[in-house]
Every structure is written in structure tokens, then in C-alpha cells.
Amino acid sequence: MKKIQISPSILSADFSQLGNEIKRLEEGGADFIHVDVMDGHFVPNLTIGPPVIKALKKNCSIKFDVHLMISPVHKYIDAYSEAGADIITIHPEATEDLSNSIKKIKELGKKVGVSLNPETKVNVIIDYLDKIDLVLIMSVNPGFGGQKFMPEVLSKIKELKKIQKEKNIDFDIEIDGGINFENSKIAIEAGANILVSGTTIFKSNNGAIKKNIDLLKSS
């Protein structure tokens, strides 16, 4: 079994203190910083552009796990790579040529992730699983933080684990959306090894980030 890693979503951070919030995550044992990038078009919200990521990366040694919810995604891959993204995750619905976008991210020396919305089936990406580093399973409809976890997506994680075994391929399975101390356990049991969490990490136990990260890791 892979080591459980935590990728806190800064969508739930105090944006007026973003640099300090990332420092707290680093000190609290976060494995990645999860950055949700939204364009108001592919999803109904607007968030973080490349200059913000570039500024935040200057004083941070943790890898940036950048989730691009933008369309057309291909034209923005270079900008987010240059800004400091270490992992770039894209949606198959947001690119005209998923194979080409995966290739571009790899050529830039970045790890590549592909995200599945709650309604997107695993077979959409089955031919690409040997070319990617990570599959991100969305357990809410993307666009806003603080939504309720959708347990029905766990079947996709189990399906991915089965494919890994049958085809002898390896990639991380990340889950994002409504993750808390209760459902993190069933997500891990299903086969997820990276948990994205925002509200639980920043708001639970009076904002005790280290405690909250430790609790999620030991689910």
C-alpha cells in the first residue's frame, strides 16, 4: 500500500494571508499544495493565475499540485509550468487532444494528472493510464469549496485499482471534494493515496493545521 499523502487546497485558506497560510501548511506536514485554477468558463468560479503561483513558490519548498479547471487548457499549460507547477492536472473535456496535452506537460518536465468529474467515466482515460502520473477523482462537482462528498465516486477508484493490477501500471490516485475525517477512511480503503482537503484542514480543531493533517494521514 502506498504512503498516504495530503494535498491541502488553498481555496479554503485566508487569501489575505496566503503566504503565511502556505508556511503553516509546510510546517504542518503537508505533502503538496493543491492549487485550484478556475476560469469562470469551464467551471463557475474565478481563482488563481500564474503570477500568484510564481510569488507563492518563491518561499516554499513543497511541490505545487496545480489543478487546471480551464478551457481550452492546452494554451495555458506553458504559463502554469513556468509559474512553478510541479504537477499539472487537466480535464479531458477541456482539451481538444488529450494525448497532445499530456505529451506537452511531460515535455515540460512536469508530472501529469488527469481529472475525472463525478459524471466522467474511467473509460474516457483508459488508453492514457500508462502515460500519466496521477488520476484525480472529483468527489464534488468542481467550482466551489465546501461541498458535500459524493460516495458514489469511490467505485471509480476501485475500478482504477483493478486496472492497475491487471495492466501492471502505476499512478497515484487522488481524491478531491468534501474530504473530512470520516470519509477519508473509506476513500483510502477504496484505493486513494492522496487526499485533497481544504475546509477540514483550515477550519477543524480551531485551525490546528498540523493536527488536522496528521488525523487525515492516520485515517
Which positions does each model-derived feature cover?
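Hydrophobic faces of well-ordered beta-strands that scaffold small-molecule active sites
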Residues: 4-9, 33-35, 56, 64-68, ...
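C-terminal helical cap(s) of enzyme catalytic domains, especially alpha/beta-barrels
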Residues: 105, 188, 202-219
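A short alpha/beta connector and helix-capping loop motif
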Residues: 41-73, 77, 184-200
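Catalytic cores of alpha/beta
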Residues: 22, 74-82, 120-132, 177-195
